[in-house]
């Protein structure tokens, strides 16, 4: 038998020992890649084929298909959001009212809502340009024009750009600063000047009417009553008596030198004057008058149904409104193809607002026997803070045209 010769005897170098399994695994372990390494890795996971090359910073960079595809999709979506977010849409809606006075046939209302302190161009040029192309008789504003930011200037710019010949009526929304001060101003002036917030007084100075109680708008020989929706189911007489009693007590306390009564008297007087204006409206409205109620958040069916059950002969409550105008939902903010809005910020909706019926999101519907129109508004809502931009949902202004003519769909039945 032949003996094996040692490495020394043969003069050959000894082969290095094989690496241990642990070292092999460590070497074979895949290096974690950053996002940019993944994006510019140059190969696809399946085939390893190169997709394309790009000269970037003086070097040839290889691009992978799927990462680039995803980036392109994100950029396209961002462009869509940017373009649609600054493009105003107009929704024109006819509202049929049986027995509408002839003076009000074809009367057109421009409805705005939910600006939330946003600007559309310098001094609201984009909105005002679109409004300038429309034919309308009055402007109704359904709240949240200032928003939680508290800056009224964008709202003021819009008011200043509207024609002075068109009457403007507005209410506050849930995201707006409080319309009434907690601590009244210690000044000599009207009750409103002592108790109303600066942004409300600023809007009034620019020609708008604050609808904190029913207001009568005369059109020819006919009347439109504009009311805040939160007064629909109030007993006007009882409210006026309660406020008057409290006001008289505080007046007496003020004379006696009670500081607490002196401090609260302006607010109580303001509430009493509101109650008196409500009572006057209840006593003045006739069956021939049109009653339009302004709400920020759309009222529930039960609330509107209750307003239809009051006996007008009792002269306690406002008559059932012919139409309620509202905003707040902002068209659902995010809308999906074939689905529409999948969420609205509503405490009274089914499923807490998730997957609502689309007729409850925007447009004309009937709630509690009353016609209700919801505009999609101009911006977003603080009630859905994660939806801080609109998606597939252009900002909207609405034109409401009153008519006594039945719609074609009803005539064909």
Which residue stretches match the model-derived regions?
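Active-site neighborhood of phospho(di)ester-bond hydrolases with catalytic His/Asp-centered motifs
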Residues: 110-113, 138-144, 148, 167-174, ...
């Amino acid at each position: 038998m032949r003996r094996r010769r040692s490495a020394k005897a043969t003069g050959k170098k000894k082969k290095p020992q094989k690496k241990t399994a642990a070292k092999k695994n460590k070497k074979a372990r895949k290096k974690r890649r950053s996002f940019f390494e993944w994006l510019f890795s140059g190969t696809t996971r399946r085939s390893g084929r190169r997709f394309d090359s790009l000269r970037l910073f003086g070097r040839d960079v290889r691009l992978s298909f799927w990462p680039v595809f995803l980036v392109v999709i994100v950029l396209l979506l961002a462009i869509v959001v940017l373009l649609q977010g600054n493009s105003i849409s107009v929704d024109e809606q006819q509202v049929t009212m049986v027995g509408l006075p002839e003076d009000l046939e074809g009367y057109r209302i421009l409805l705005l809502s939910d600006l939330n302190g946003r600007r559309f161009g310098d001094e609201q040029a984009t909105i005002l340009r679109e409004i300038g192309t429309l034919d309308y008789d009055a402007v109704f504003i359904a709240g949240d024009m200032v928003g939680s930011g508290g800056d009224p200037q964008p709202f003021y710019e819009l008011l200043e750009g509207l024609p002075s010949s068109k009457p403007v009526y507005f209410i506050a929304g849930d995201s707006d600063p409080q319309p009434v001060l907690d601590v009244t101003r210690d000044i000599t002036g009207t009750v409103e000047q002592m108790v109303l917030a600066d942004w409300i007084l600023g809007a009034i100075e620019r020609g708008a009417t604050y609808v904190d109680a029913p207001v009568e708008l005369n059109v020819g020989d006919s009347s439109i009553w504009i009311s805040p929706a939160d007064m629909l189911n109030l007993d006007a007489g009882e409210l006026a008596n309660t406020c008057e009693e409290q006001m008289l007590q505080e007046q007496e306390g003020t004379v006696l030198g009670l500081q607490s009564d002196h401090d609260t008297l302006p607010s109580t007087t303001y509430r009493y004057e509101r109650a008196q204006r409500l009572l006057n409206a209840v006593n003045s409205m006739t069956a021939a008058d049109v009653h339009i109620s302004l709400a920020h958040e759309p009222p529930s069916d039960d609330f509107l149904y209750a307003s239809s059950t009051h006996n007008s002969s009792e002269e306690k409550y406002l008559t059932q409104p012919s139409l309620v105008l509202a905003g707040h939902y902002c068209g659902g903010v995010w809308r999906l193809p074939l689905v529409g809005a999948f969420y609205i910020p509503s405490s009274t909706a089914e499923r807490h607002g998730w997957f609502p019926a689309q007729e409850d999101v925007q447009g004309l519907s009937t709630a509690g026997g009353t016609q209700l129109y919801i505009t999609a508004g101009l911006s977003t809502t603080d009630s859905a803070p994660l939806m801080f931009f609109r998606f597939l949902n252009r900002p909207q202004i609405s034109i409401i045209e009153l008519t006594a003519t039945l719609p074609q769909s009803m005539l064909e039945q």
